[in-house]
């Protein structure tokens, strides 16, 4: 009898054990990201907001009559940024930093040409640390190699500086979360330098979408398709033994869309991401590496057995509100440059590459304020040139009206770089929220590691982290911020007066040096 009771108790324990919920298995990636399965979807562990820490949605800083800037990274993109800032009133270039002191010194010639005073020079692996400690810098503009974006930004934020970071601004989820937390704790801006949000077609189309020209936009595409075969040798190499350069080596070691922001940024603004909608689920798929693998073998003379980044990567995202985003990445195969930028609305369609055009029916075009000049206008084809020109003229973005002409003169990827820099300075001078915040940065840069996790698990669905921590629906609709005409005029007058005096000083300093 006693034996029977023991057997019954043991059996009951087995049943209870089998029926009790088991803790899900926690997996850890090589980047330290923890995730687990939940009903067939991968859920990445996200940190809670620490007590006392607040969101920076809509963050503003006190107005700055003058924006004092330190530039870090003066290789391929940095010098162009220095040059553009000499054309923006109310800015002062205080310091220049690069690993190679010759590159930093070379940018003094840009200042000389613009009659701007010399800047302080910093160099070496950690030269940026001293730059960030200066008390006469408001903004640190970062255009270094990808792996240095985060440590430089972290140092700048910890030293009380606003930061503007070239793309991709963060290379993994941990860096995304760290920048979110740093911006929230320091109350400093963390701006992603995504220039493609300021290109002409994208800005005008955004304005059309916000005014209902396409109806509800339910699907969007973006991409970075750019054959870099002519550029691989121009990326910085760390000594004679470095045969690949930093960018090719990063592609070799990392799977996923490592350069997603050019394609994702503009369409995320159209879809009001974390301003009424959010990216909810992601899945990614890539081809095998053929060109990338071959490049490494040609440059090293050794077999490459594990080139992680596929020659072409496609990432699909579903939003909370049932929209779909498709983002592509290909820097390997021969084909024309292409960022796709395609919007599918319930009443119209927009497409940038390879042919710019809009497709609207006659009724929708009329409802959008443009009267068709042809009979039987149909959305089966793009608008005729006259109708397209009229639509673009009606919905030309206010920012393009303000900066477009001078941007074409100054340049920088056709002018969009100058518009981006000008808007950054404008918002700082007028104490406004920036066009992109740290949550944009984190969301757009997160595609790389999230896609890698998806593909390393048979292209499984991955839940997208909510970097706003539940506040993605607080703001209704993406909007650019503007000062009142009176405030804008007062700010610009002060900016121009400062720059005029600065150039007088600079011209005297350079003349004195020439006389030595």
UniProtKB/Swiss-Prot annotation:
EC number(s) on file? 3.2.1.-
Q: Which InterPro entries match?
A: Gfo/Idh/MocA-like_OxRdtase_N, Gfo/Idh/MocA_oxidrdct_glycsds, Glyco_hydro_109_C, NAD(P)-bd_dom_sf
Which GO CC terms are listed, alphabetically?
plasma membrane
Q: Which UniProt keywords apply?
A: Cell membrane, Glycosidase, Hydrolase, Lipoprotein, Membrane, NAD, Palmitate, Signal
Task: Show the GO MF annotations.
Answer: hydrolase activity, acting on glycosyl bonds; nucleotide binding
Pfam short name (any one): Glyco_hydro_109_C
What does the cofactor section's free text say about binding? Binds 1 NAD(+) per subunit. The NAD(+) cannot dissociate.
How does this protein lie in the membrane?
Lipid-anchor
Q: Where, per UniProt, does this protein localize?
A: Cell membrane
* S-diacylglycerol cysteine lipid attachment residues: 19
What are the binding positions for substrate in this chain?
224, 247, 259-262, 337
Which residues, per the entry, are lipid-modified as N-palmitoyl cysteine?
19
Q: Which domain of life is it from?
A: Bacteria
Question: What family name appears in the similarity comment?
Answer: Belongs to the Gfo/Idh/MocA family. Glycosyl hydrolase 109 subfamily.
> What PANTHER family does the entry give?
BCDNA.GH03377, GLYCOSYL HYDROLASE FAMILY 109 PROTEIN
| Protein known as | Glycosyl hydrolase family 109 protein 4
């Amino acid at each position: 009898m006693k034996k029977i009771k023991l057997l019954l108790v043991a059996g009951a324990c087995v049943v209870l054990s089998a029926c009790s919920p088991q803790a899900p298995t926690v997996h850890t990636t090589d980047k330290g990201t923890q995730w687990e399965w939940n009903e067939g979807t991968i859920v990445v562990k996200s940190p809670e907001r620490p007590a006392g820490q607040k969101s920076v949605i809509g963050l503003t800083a006190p107005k700055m009559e003058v924006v004092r800037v330190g530039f870090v990274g003066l290789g391929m993109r940095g010098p162009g940024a220095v040059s553009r800032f000499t054309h923006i009133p109310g800015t002062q270039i205080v310091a220049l930093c690069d690993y190679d002191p010759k590159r930093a010194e070379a940018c003094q010639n840009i200042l000389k040409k613009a009659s701007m005073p010399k800047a302080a020079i910093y160099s070496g692996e950690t030269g940026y640390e001293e730059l960030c400690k200066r008390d006469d810098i408001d903004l640190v503009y970062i255009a270094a190699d990808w792996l240095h974006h985060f440590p430089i930004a972290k140092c700048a934020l910890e030293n009380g500086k606003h930061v503007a970071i070239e793309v991709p601004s963060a290379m993994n989820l941990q860096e995304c979360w760290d920048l979110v937390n740093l911006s929230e704790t320091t109350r400093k801006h963390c701006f992603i330098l995504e220039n493609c949000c300021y290109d002409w077609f994208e800005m005008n189309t955004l304005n059309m979408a916000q005014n209902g020209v396409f109806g509800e936009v339910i699907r969007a595409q973006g991409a970075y398709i750019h054959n870099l075969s002519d550029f691989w040798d121009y990326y910085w190499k760390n000594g004679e033994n470095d045969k690949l350069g930093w960018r090719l080596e990063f592609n070799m070691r990392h799977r996923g869309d490592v350069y997603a922001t050019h394609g994702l940024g503009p369409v995320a603004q159209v879809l009001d991401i974390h301003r009424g909608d959010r990216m909810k689920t992601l899945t990614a798929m890539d081809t095998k590496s053929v060109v990338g693998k071959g490049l490494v073998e040609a440059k090293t003379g050794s077999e490459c057995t594990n080139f992680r980044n596929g020659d072409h990567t496609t990432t699909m995202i579903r939003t909370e509100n049932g929209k779909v985003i498709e983002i592509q990445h290909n820097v390997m195969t021969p084909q024309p440059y292409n960022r796709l930028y395609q919007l599918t609305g319930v009443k119209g369609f927009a497409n940038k590459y390879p042919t710019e055009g809009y497709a609207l029916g006659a009724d929708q075009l009329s409802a959008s304020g443009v009267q068709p000049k042809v009979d039987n206008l149909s959305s089966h084809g793009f608008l005729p040139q006259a109708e397209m020109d009229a639509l673009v003229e009606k919905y030309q973005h206010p920012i393009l009206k303000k900066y477009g002409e001078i941007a074409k003169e100054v340049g920088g990827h056709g002018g969009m770089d100058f518009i981006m820099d000008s808007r950054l300075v404008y918002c700082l001078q007028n104490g406004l929220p920036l066009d992109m915040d740290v949550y944009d940065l984190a969301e757009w840069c997160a595609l790389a590691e999230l896609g890698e996790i998806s593909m390393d698990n048979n292209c499984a669905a991955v839940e997208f982290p909510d970097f706003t921590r539940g506040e993605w629906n607080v703001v209704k609709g993406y909007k650019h911020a503007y000062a009142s005409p009176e405030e804008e005029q007062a700010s610009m007058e002060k900016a121009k007066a400062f720059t005029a005096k600065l150039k007088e000083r600079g011209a005297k300093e350079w003349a004195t040096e020439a006389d030595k």
